[in-house]
């Protein structure tokens, strides 16, 4: 058995769509994280690893931003990956031309639709916004591109106007419409309501682009899928503007383990992908980050360690090797004899029961003095109790 979750999950009557597309925006929205700037080779390396995972679509960048960005997007588009390569564009002909020049498979055009954005940012009326959006959709489709239209700040947009703009986008040939929860301001219940309302009016695919300002990006994405959405936007490690986006690894594993929806991804590379993005973005993954954090499979408490050594699933919902992660027993204040003995066995060291108890006592004392029990300190402790040993 590789995982063990609550049997009550199966009691709920849930219906996911038959087809779910994940389009990853690590290379675009992820790069918009303050302080992050990826070079072409770094983007290529991440794109290759995403492709190895089996991601369906990669949002490779925003070509009009700079010449270097165009080089990066074009390099990814011509890398021969299995994933569809998308680019972000404003609802402007020049933006779409820049994307076309990069040889991408499709574009995501976006425009803010909330009255707040229309008034204070775009200085447009609703009618003016409608016309601008449709002209760009028509232009992109005339050039044979996959076209997704994203309503920025959709979750704070008047519902009737949102329906109107999505209906018109569908009529103009959009392949998909995106609900952008731009500031993470909707609840899972609100997302459920919104998607169901939109489903009454439009037949085109609906995607969820959720931000994590209130820690609800994953829940909102899943709620949207259950309500009739068919695609989700993600980033590796959940990076992105402000509090970030729906985490790719969390979504994939929640669907697979909690909901038993297997999208066919090569999940064995998830941990490696996480570390690659950490390296290139220079954004350290939090120790307790779900799925890929370093603490997720670390155990210190004596009671926990005893159980995990006997059966890992006592204190792990799934085995770390599923995603290329590793389990680690950490020594500290809460460690017991079993944990220390396991650590000694790693180095092939035998001790008497009395020596073991003394080593445990010294481990606890040192940790309570604020010292981290690394291999060097552990060696010194063992040496002080048992005499010289080979590590």
Curated annotation (Swiss-Prot):
Pathway membership: Organic acid metabolism; 2-oxosuberate biosynthesis
SUPFAM superfamilies in the record: Aldolase
Gene3D superfamilies linked to this entry: 1.10.238.260, Aldolase class I (3.20.20.70)
EC number assigned by the record: 2.3.3.14, 2.3.3.-
Family matches, as InterPro entries: AIPM/Hcit_synth_CS, Aldolase_TIM, LEU1_arch, LeuA/HCS_post-cat, PYR_CT
Enzyme class: transferase
BP-aspect Gene Ontology terms: biosynthetic process; carboxylic acid metabolic process
Residue ranges of domain Pyruvate carboxyltransferase in the record: 20-271
Catalysed reaction equations from the record: acetyl-CoA + 2-oxoglutarate + H2O = (2R)-homocitrate + CoA + H(+); 2-oxoadipate + acetyl-CoA + H2O = (R)-dihomocitrate + CoA + H(+); 2-oxoheptanedioate + acetyl-CoA + H2O = (R)-trihomocitrate + CoA + H(+)
Pfam families, per database record: HCS_D2, HMGL-like
Keyword Transferase set for record: yes
GO MF term list: homocitrate synthase activity
Protein function: Catalyzes the condensation of alpha-ketoglutarate and acetyl-CoA to form (R)-homocitrate. Can also catalyze the condensation of alpha-ketoadipate with acetyl-CoA to form (R)-homo(2)citrate, and the condensation of alpha-ketopimelate with acetyl-CoA to form (R)-homo(3)citrate. These reactions are part of the biosynthesis pathway of coenzyme B and biotin.
Family under the similarity heading: Belongs to the alpha-IPM synthase/homocitrate synthase family.
NCBIfam families linked to this entry: LEU1_arch, PRK00915.1-2
Name of the molecule in the record: Homocitrate synthase AksA
